[in-house]
């Protein structure tokens, strides 16, 4: 009964308010705000969005050799490892001004040491300024991905294999560095690059069809150790042939890399300033999966690498690449993408202990199940052989393992 009385009173109040509004002279009413007033009232922080993704992994199913590991790929591979967050990201992005774009990405699964996990760390922090209204020409300042290699530029949330290739990723560890980059792409090409990601075709994102940049060269979140900047250039041109989209590309970088003291073993022989030539060039070719897809890259160059015969670090030749084949198909309301990747690399890894000299090859066979827009499950079986030398270790292991990843996007 009390509820009925409350409802009746509320209805009566609404009717009275409506009658009062109708009887009020038009002069006393406030005018509705114009679109210009609404626009001017909006604040820059109203244009900032928040998004992210997380990757939960287990790498030890059907493991044949617990001594097989890969520091560059995933430290969760190998003995005494268990469940892990490989990545857990939060992104703040938006346009505080019509020609200014900001992008700040945090990772809250970073390891501070082998015994301390899940620290918050900046991955990206940059600003793009566009010189024209169409935003075809822009300059980027800050810590960002270096435009070298499709595999490096493609977000890990879009990549089919669980880790980037050794050959391309060893050139730009963590894919990122601090610098300034000039990018150009016609408006229609920018729309195509955006669509390749939004339509689930595993695009790399928009780094222009041409990019030119200067960056420190010591990798992300690390201080500059010499007076030489790296220079990088990339030309990549996506185009459509019938129902297929193809993107060929070429890129190169050159600079001087300085080995940090904490990555050198006592007794290893190095140059007086520990600074070495570091340069590479790479070719890329991508056929986006509609339904069959191919992604292939190969790079070559020279960089610091350990020489076991002289117990020294010197500049040595390097080469290697990968090829990934995939097939995208619908399964009810979900999408299945089976894939296979073969990769090979022979050369140094400048960012590892004593600039280890590697000789590796690996085949990965897997399937990505896109359960929904926000949930994906990937199973991947790896057949791997890894050999490297540093001052303390002559490592040579091979083995197989089944890996599982659950990815959520938010």
Give the predicted meaning of each segment.
Residues 4-7, 91, 343, 405-407:
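Residue-level detector of intrinsically disordered/flexible regions characterized by low predicted structural confidence
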Residues 2-69, 410:
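N-terminal periplasmic/intermembrane-space "pro-region" immediately following the signal or transit peptide
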Residues 24-28, 43-46, 61-68, 76-77, ...:
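Outer-membrane beta-barrel pore domains
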Residues 221-230, 248, 259-261:
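Surface loops at the rim/top face of extracytoplasmic beta-rich domains
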Residues 37-63, 77-217, 225-232, 236-242, ...:
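Outer membrane beta-barrel
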Residues 16-17, 101, 309:
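Hydrophobic alpha-helical membrane context
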Residues 14-15, 108, 307, 383:
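Alpha-helical transmembrane segments and their juxtamembrane interfaces
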